Curated annotation (Swiss-Prot):
CDD domains named in the record: RNA_pol_B_RPB2
PANTHER family tied to this protein: DNA-DIRECTED RNA POLYMERASE I SUBUNIT 2
Task of the protein: DNA-dependent RNA polymerase catalyzes the transcription of DNA into RNA using the four ribonucleoside triphosphates as substrates.
Protein name, UniProt field: DNA-directed RNA polymerase subunit beta
Keywords: DNA-directed RNA polymerase, Nucleotidyltransferase, Transcription, Transferase
Keyword Nucleotidyltransferase: yes
């Protein structure tokens, strides 16, 4: 069987050495999976609790009224079918959305007045419409008001607990002040911080600070409890005349020199003299022997310590000392003890004192000092304090204070840590709480403060906020969920009020609900949120990149002004997650990033990247995805580490990284290895061949400029690619893929009809119709056009490309063209990166692109009467109407120029009072022209082109004009043709199945003229019409049943087809929903061909950009010895300082590819002459190398081989993947095989003189793009035009048809030259001298050449301003005194 056309698509010679273990995931998976989870959360066997829409409804419902006599519960929700499909929404400027239907249950209770018991009185269920929910298209976008938009994912700080310090900036001493912050997903922030005096404070929502013990009291703790939570207790026992006996901690004396003898309390021997060093060996011995447990310490050793518990007089209940009090001894002048807490206790006979284990080295007294500084002593006063901080100026009561404190952190409606926050908190503080507990509790707060004091004591590390384990991604689904929750909460208030105000018994759920707030929240999010962006649709790559973008801006994110260097910088954890290269230049640098190629977002919103497992130095094919936090524990080798056949490491030391540090490790220390070398860059960066030879700054420009490449008339896949071009084309949705295997039945430019040969679902019709998009306008006015690649009879497999879209060539991304370039100066025309181009580029339309502009006009109903779209326009000659049809609308195919009328429209004018004579004349002649004015839609200045499409929209009940009816007829015909084709294939399919079923069987009875019992064969069937075949009854019951089932399936599919057709036709014929006051709307699409011209911007893929300076005739361009003319001449000085050497390697490689293609072409010509295929095979083997040739071509039949060879005659495509591509020897080898000098340079001749240039020149083939910065869109010329209202100076900018600014510095320049008259003219008559410029215009029209300058308007403005200051300034004429 012959391969299909696309099955033999171009094969690239692959230079990568590393085997790909993992397919690249779908590039727009981020968008799709996130929104699917949001919309479908309620479907499936078990509804996912707390996820998506389901979760939002569960969190807001049930809603109770204020006295709890009724409750409104949520049962389930479902999305109905959308009213219009994607294309219809785009045409009609509507939002592609599905109605959301929610089932609610209202339960009404009877409350017993006396006992207060509640009993159910009534239950009602009802479906309620809750607004429209926008749906995502197959390509991951949304259609909002007819335009395609993308919701960009947002990077924000993950909820959880963070520890940090001020880097010594707050206090002049440079002391580090530590702080800790608990960030919830929603709710109040809680901060703990040290001040310069080492006292710990708490802040709620960044308000005034409170001592942290106040918060602990408010949590219901007392002084002893607080001391217990933060400090260990050590007992001191007093022995008269010997001192105190206390526990011995050998660890604490290691490496120190004690100030007193260490005496063993049990034996009384000195184990270490004062001033001697305790060596680690001694300490180890003490620990191992474990004989010395207690020490005897001098009496004054306890002074200054703090008591651990309240010590009370048991009999009277008097408190002698409280927990946290200092033990003191007070002396008089003679040194006699006269008081102090320690003396008090000893006098009372208390010799056993529990003391806090604070040594000021390992454990500091911060919490104890805070407690001493805190004036609160109990819960009530602490709560009041917190209330005063949160609600200043309101009189506090204990109940109100307690209620406020409870709602702040412990009420799940007001406070939500989210699953992520709980997981992060558990990890940081070693808690083991379930991730369903989403509020704080006492343990969390105690643990946070403990971790903070330990940081101050030098234990542990602070967190890095730029670590990707501490930043997470909020994708579409989650952003939408938050927005919808806001809408529902607004609705909840209204429902509660309504429940208490109406008679609840007689009411239905429908009457309680007003869905406007929820619908408005959704509409606002899609319409005006900072993260809902107009899709960048310049080319397929820009679409994909836009959907994979991660922004740190937006609601709840950073702002450009506040973001510092650290946030924008590349972090080690970006590896394999976010691209270090692709980010915008300018103020957003580093705030907007791109997802790396293999990265994905996990259920908690952290970015994960895949690694292969390594077990004992053996690399396996097991792939694991890891988030940044998990990766910290592993040692990861790079993808380019050399492995042997078995997958073991070759070298003894392997370059690897662990916890963000690079190091060399032996093979057995390595756990993971990268999946692929391109996993660390984004899609755009991985499209740059030889990226490893480019400087990062230029690679950044290269990846950004590929997104601005305009789709050209003819696409051309790059000779030198990276091998992922096909993936991008596939996932972007630009090219059309076959949904299932089949045979091509019909093909024309607008659709492909496929007879399916595989059934994905039973009962599915066996026909696929692919509608191609022809000359549609993209968001950036570039042209979207699809071309079929297949021919009738081709076999296609599932997932194969059947049609190319914009910027795709045989299913591969093709943003530019391969052109022959030379690096040499040429008469200064390539100064400062300018580009010199050959006229061949214009002649052959190499860089010609089509741009489509849309113009629309609406006829409204005004106060003075309706506007009218008509051909009958007052005061307009027949010449101006030449392109309009009888309805006043331009016809398709008309060539239009600036000022041409596209749609004729007249608007009623206000009646001016008329004289009786006028009235009489009007009555006689019926003159209508004077009361309407011409408001036709005209083509704006600077626009030329051809009309490619016209759409007319009418309001319901408004009569359609001829043009609208004609468009409607064409549309219905098209739908009918689709239906008929589908039906024909369906019938063919079903009848062939029926025939195989009944052939050779016996008919029991049949239509007229068929004998019972006759055998069914071809002859018998040919006498019957197809419809009569069903009437043949078979003897076998099983057979009869099968025929019956087939008949039912046929009828059902026919019915479905008719129903679909009817539905579409009805939509076409029905009027349109237009905005209020609009009766009729016409849209006109104008296409213009833009050839390349001086001033247009071009770029390569390596950040090498330039502007075209001149178009040179072909014969004047430099040429090679074989007569090949160069297409572009570039400046060689653009390479060294910019360090993007990749472009030179690409040029050489492209030159070799072209040379090999020419060799294959010559071999094919030989074959056509001689019929011998050997030279073709040899040329192919030479071009592709033995390995690729054996794998891809060796077993093809001759016809296929010739077909495939003829496809690479222009150049043999190669793939050199990033970081794993062709090296210098490979480039040299390719040039050698192509028969070129290995220097890559050629002798070049000057086209003007025919003389040889003095030195060889680097000539090669380079992939160049034409960018979306076209001179036609930037340059315009103004003679006269609009003026600013106050200053009367011309406006600025092309959009306002403004003038050229002559600023302060330009005035200085003219002054310096003494060009007085030029200057006067510039500042008066050419700008804001109103009378003067009018006179000058008149004199030019009359052909005179004199003018007079008057007073500029700006001078009058100055005079008025001075008068505003209270100084009356008057101008006197020269002759007045």
């Amino acid at each position: 069987m012959a391969q299909s056309y696309v099955g033999q698509k171009r094969i690239r010679r692959y230079y990568g050495k590393i085997r790909e273990v993992l397919e690249m995931p779908n590039l727009i998976e981020v968008q799709k999976s996130s929104y699917d989870l949001f919309l479908k959360s309620g479907e499936g066997p078990k509804a996912a609790d707390g996820e998506g829409i389901q979760g939002v409804f569960q969190s807001v419902f049930p809603i109770k009224d204020f006295n709890e006599t009724a409750v409104l519960e949520f049962v389930k929700y479902e999305l109905e079918k959308p009213k219009y499909d994607v294309d219809e929404c785009q045409q009609r400027d509507m939002t592609y959305a599905a109605p959301l239907k929610v089932t609610l249950r209202l339960i009404v209770f009877d409350v017993d007045e006396t006992t207060g018991a509640r009993s159910v009185k009534d239950i009602k269920e009802q479906d309620v419409y809750m607004g429209d929910m926008p749906l995502m298209t197959a390509n991951g976008t949304f259609i909002v008001n007819g335009t395609e938009r993308v919701i960009v994912s947002q990077m924000h700080r993950s909820p959880g607990v963070f520890f940090d310090h001020d880097k010594g900036k707050t206090h002049s001493s440079g002391k580090l002040l530590f702080a800790c912050r608990i960030i919830p997903y929603r709710g109040s922030w809680l901060d703990f911080e040290f001040d310069a005096k080492d006292i710990v404070f708490a802040r709620i929502d960044r308000r005034r600070k409170l001592p942290v013990t106040t918060l602990l009291y408010a949590l219901g703790m007392d002084q002893e409890g607080i001391m217990d939570a933060y400090y260990d207790t050590v007992d001191f026992k007093y022995q008269k005349n010997r001192g105190w006996v206390t526990r011995f901690f050998p660890e604490r004396v290691r490496g120190t020199r004690p100030t007193y003898d260490l005496v063993d309390a049990a034996t009384g021997e000195v184990i270490l003299k004062a001033g001697e060093k305790a060596t680690p060996r001694m300490v180890k011995k003490w620990i191992d022997d474990a004989q010395i447990t207690e020490l005897l310490v001098p009496f004054d050793h306890i002074v200054g310590r703090y008591v651990a518990r309240d010590i009370i007089n048991e009999e009277t209940g008097e408190i002698w000392v409280e927990a946290g009090d200092e033990l003191t001894m007070e002396y008089d002048r003679d040194g006699e003890v006269k008081g102090g807490t320690l003396k008090l206790l000893l006098d009372q006979g208390i010799t056993d004192i529990p003391v806090l284990d604070i040594d000021n080295v390992n454990v500091g007294p911060y919490i104890r000092n805070t407690m001493a500084a805190d004036k609160n002593m109990g819960r009530d006063t602490a709560l009041m304090d917190i209330y005063r901080v949160m609600r200043p100026g309101e009189p506090p009561t204990v109940e109100a204070a307690a209620a406020l404190f409870d709602t702040l952190f412990f009420d799940s409606e007001r406070y939500d840590l989210s699953a992520v926050g709980r997981v992060k908190m558990n990890m940081r503080l070693d808690l083991g709480k379930p991730d369903t507990q989403r509020t704080l509790d006492r343990d969390d707060i105690i643990a946070c403060i403990k971790a903070l004091t330990e940081l101050r004591d030098g234990k542990g590390e602070i967190d890095d906020i730029d670590h990707l384990g501490n930043r997470r991604v909020r994708s579409v689904g989650e952003l939408m969920e938050n927005q919808y929750r806001v809408g529902l909460l607004r609705m909840e208030r209204a429902i509660k009020e309504r429940m208490s105000s109406v008679e609840i018994d007689t009411i239905m759920p429908q009457d309680l609900i007003n869905a406007k707030p929820a619908a408005a929240a959704v509409r606002e999010f899609f319409g005006s949120s900072q993260l809902s962006q107009f899709m960048d649709q310049t080319n397929p790559l820009s679409e994909v990149t836009h959907k994979r973008r991660l922004s740190a801006l937006g609601p709840g994110g950073l702002t450009r002004e506040r973001a510092g260097f650290e946030v924008r910088d590349v972090h080690p954890t970006h590896y394999g997650r976010m691209c270090p290269i692709e980010t915008p230049e300018g103020q957003n640098i580093g705030l907007i990033n791109s997802l790396a190629t293999f990265a994905r977002v996990n259920k908690y919103g952290f970015i994960e990247t895949p690694y292969r497992k390594v077990i004992e130095g053996q690399v396996t094919d097991d792939v694991v995805y890891m988030s940044a936090t998990e990766e910290m524990r592993h040692t990861v080798a790079q993808a380019n580490a050399t492995l042997d056949e078995e997958g073991r490491f070759v070298s003894d030391l392997i370059s690897s990284r662990k916890a963000g540090e690079f190091m060399l490790n032996p093979p057995d220390a390595i756990d993971l290895i990268d999946v692929s070398p391109k996993q660390l860059v984004s899609v755009a960066a991985s499209l740059i061949p030889f990226l490893e030879n480019d400087d990062a700054n230029r690679a950044l420009m290269g990846s950004n400029m590929q997104r601005q490449a305009v789709p050209l008339l003819q696409s051309d896949a790059p000779f030198v690619g990276t091998g992922i071009e096909a993936v991008v084309a596939r996932d972007s949705g630009a090219a059309i893929m076959a949904r299932r295997a089949g045979v091509i039945d019909q093909v024309d430019a607008t659709r492909i009809v496929v007879r399916a040969t595989e059934m994905l679902e039973p009962g599915e019709p066996g026909v696929d119709i692919y509608r191609l998009r022809k000359f549609k306008r993209s968001n950036q006015s570039s042209c979207i056009n699809q071309r079929p690649l297949v021919k009738v009879g081709d076999v296609v497999h599932r997932g194969e490309v059947v049609a190319d879209g914009p910027c795709t060539d045989m299913g591969e991304l093709a943003l530019g063209r391969n052109v022959v370039v030379a690096f040499m100066p040429w008469n200064g025309y390539n100064y400062e990166d300018s580009i010199l181009i050959s006229e061949r580029i214009l002649r052959d339309d190499v860089y010609t692109s089509i741009h489509i502009e849309e113009y629309e006009v609406a006829a409204r109903d005004t106060k003075l009467g309706p506007e009218e779209i008509t051909r009958d326009i007052p005061n307009v000659g027949e010449e101006a109407l030449r392109n309009l049809d009888e309805a006043g609308i331009v016809y398709i195919g008309a060539e239009v120029q600036p000022g041409d009328i596209l749609v004729g429209k007249i608007t009623p004018k206000g009646e001016s009072p008329m004289t009786p004579e006028e009235k009489l004349l009007r009555a006689i002649f019926g003159e209508k022209a004077s009361d309407v004015r011409d408001t036709s839609l005209r083509l704006p200045p600077g626009a030329y082109g051809t009309i490619v499409e016209v759409r007319v929209f009418n309001r319901h009940g408004v009569d359609k004009d001829e043009r609208a009816l004609q468009i409607e007829r064409e549309e219905v015909e098209r739908l009918a043709r689709d239906r008929d084709d589908e039906l024909a294939i369906l019938e063919r399919n079903i009848y062939s199945r029926l025939k195989t079923l009944i052939m050779g069987k016996v008919a029991v009875k049949g239509p007229k003229g068929i004998k019972a019992g006759s055998e069914i064969n071809d002859e018998l069937l040919s006498t019957l019409s197809r419809g009569q075949w069903w009437q043949l009854a078979l003897g076998e019951e099983a057979d009869a049943k099968e025929v019956e089932a087939l008949h039912e399936q046929f009828e059902a599919q026919k019915r479905a087809l008719d129903h679909r057709f009817e539905d579409k036709v009805e939509k076409v014929r029905r009027g349109d929903d237009l905005p209020p006051g609009v009766m009729k709307m016409v849209k006109v699409f104008v296409a213009v061909k833009r050839k390349l011209q001086p001033g247009d911007k071009m770029a390569g893929r390596h950040g090498n950009k330039g502007v075209i300076s001149k178009v040179v005739p072909i014969e004047d361009m430099p040429f090679l010895a074989d007569g090949t003319h160069v297409d572009l001449v570039l400046n060689p000085l653009g390479v060294p300082s910019r360090m993007n050497v990749g472009q030179i390697l690409e040029t050489h490689m492209g030159w070799a590819a072209r040379g090999l293609g020419i060799q294959i072409d010559e071999a094919l010509q030989d074959y056509r002459r001689s019929g011998d295929l050997t030279p073709v095979k040899e040329a192919m083997r030479l071009a592709y190398g033995d390995e690729t040739y054996e794998g891809a071509f060796a077993d093809r039949d001759d016809e296929d081989l010739v077909e495939m060879a003829s496809r690479v005659t222009k150049g043999v495509p190669i793939a050199t993947p990033v970081f794993d591509g062709a090296k210098e020897p490979d480039v040299n080898d390719a040039l050698r095989r192509a028969g070129f000098d290995q220097s890559g340079q050629s002798i070049v001749f000057d086209g003007r003189t025919g003389e040889q240039f003095a030195r060889p020149v680097t000539v090669g083939v380079k992939y160049m793009l034409k960018l979306h910065h076209l001179v036609d869109d930037k340059l315009h010329a103004r003679s006269t035009g609009p003026y600013s209202l106050v200053t009367q100076q011309p406006l600025g900018g092309k959009a306002q048809f403004g003038g050229q600014r002559l600023g302060e510095m330009e005035v200085w320049a003219l002054e310096a030259y003494g060009a007085a008259y030029t200057l006067q003219e510039m500042l008066t008559v050419k700008s804001d001298d109103v009378a003067g410029r009018t006179k000058m215009y008149e004199s030019i029209v009359k052909g005179e050449d004199n003018f007079e300058a008057g007073v500029p308007e700006s001078f009058n403005v100055l005079v008025k301003e001075v008068r505003g200051l209270g100084l009356n300034m008057e101008l006197l004429d020269a002759d007045e005194e």
